[in-house]
Structure formats: C-alpha cells, structure tokens
Amino acid sequence: MIKFNIKLLVLSFLLLISLKPLQSAEMVDPIKVDWSFKGLTGTFDRASLQRGFQVYKEVCASCHSMQYLSYRNLGEPGGPEFSEQEVKAIAASFEIEDGPDSQGEMFTRPGKPSDKFKSPYPNVQAATAANGGAYPPDMSVLVKARKGGANYIYSVLVGYEDPPPGVTLDDGVYYNKYMAGNKIKMPNNLMDGLVEYADGTESTVDQMAKDV
C-alpha cells in the first residue's frame, strides 16, 4: 500500500509538471476598458473614431481590409461623422478599378463615396501568402466577430511581450498572452508616436489601441 501511494504521488507530480507548459499557454482574460459606447445608453466618441480611422489608414490598411464598409459610412451620424467634402477627399485618395469600358477594358479612377473600401490584396490567397500563411481578418465587423469584442482587440494590440523563459517561437511568430496559445503571426505594429494625430492627441500605444 505504501509503495502504491508513493507511485501515485510520483505520477501526480509528473502530471503537474507536464501540465505546466499548457497552463502557461492559456489565454489571459481581456482587459476591461470603460468604453464610451458601453451599455444601452452608450455613444461613440466622434473624435476617437476619427483618430481610429487615421490609425487604420496609416497603419492597418496595408494588411487588413474593411470590405463591408463604403467610404460614405465615414460621414454617417453615430460614426466618425466626417463632412461631405472630407468623405469625398478620402474616397478620391484611392484608385479604384472599374469597368469594363466601351472597349471591354478595365480601368482605374479616383474613388467615390459610394465605393467599398479598397482592399490591400486582390484575394484571400494573396493576403494569406503575403502574411506568412495567416489571413489578416477583415476589420469591418471585427468587434462583433470576436469574443470579448473591443476589450479583446484592445488587449491583443497592447499584449505583446517577450516570451517567458523556456518558451521558444518560430520565425514570424510573436508572443501575446491574449491570443490562443499565446502566439500570433501579426507583428507588433504600434509604437508610441507612430501616428501624428490631426487633433493633436498624443499617440501612445494605449491611445491608438483604444481609438482603432
């Protein structure tokens, strides 16, 4: 009986050791942020939404699409509420493929408010190949698509850390405690002062992660 108990203790100890790496790779619950839009009576902060679009345009748009939104959505009530002229200028800053013309040829033209946001890649395959085999998710409805919503996205953006001792990562993989397995293929793209906000707000990592 004593030998059996000793064996049981040894097996239990070995089991605890084997489980330790798994426990260290568990996702951490997202940080809870006091969002202005929280609750039934919450409203979006117009200035924050405009800053968030600036972060998207200057940082995120090189990889992430917003294919379910049109440029005119930027001027709608409850959103960033850019003026009509601002929306036209934003849309016109993009070259949109259109056609065919009378000769059957495709052509490019300046964007219009009615156009969908231009995607950075022509298709899913191209986007996946350009990002190490990981498809950058579309950001149109990302908050609704992710468990934890805005808290989760914010946490991931501020959650990059050096891996703890004993944890090794493949090339092109980064440690982030808010991701499943604590691994993410998207590099840490935010750093203090990266964007010069049009309204003069200091662009800390925390601020940009909240705005976008």
Residue ranges: model-predicted function:
Residues G75-A130:
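Structured domain cores in non-transmembrane regions
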